[in-house]
A protein has these predicted regions:
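Short Lys/Arg-rich basic patches
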Residues: 1-11, 20-23, 28-31
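Short, positively charged interaction helices/loops
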Residues: 43-64
């Protein structure tokens, strides 16, 4: 992937554990989910609104 950008983000530990458990026997990775989510966010107004209004996360001191 020559056109990729290395970055780091903080992810809620419980969400990450649940994601890993859910995807353990699939080909879905956090990188795939992130890239697809960003693409949908930029291309799909309904998805963007869903993400921007989602407030079902527990605050942990980071920008959720």
């Amino acid at each position: 992937m020559n056109n990729s950008k290395l970055t780091s983000v903080k992810i809620l530990e419980d969400l990450y554990k649940r994601f890993k458990a859910t995807t353990v026997n699939t080909k879905m990775t956090l990188q795939k989910l992130t890239n697809r989510s960003i693409d949908l966010y930029l291309m799909d107004e309904n998805y963007k609104n869903t993400i921007e209004t989602h407030d079902n996360l527990t605050a942990s001191g980071s920008n959720l």
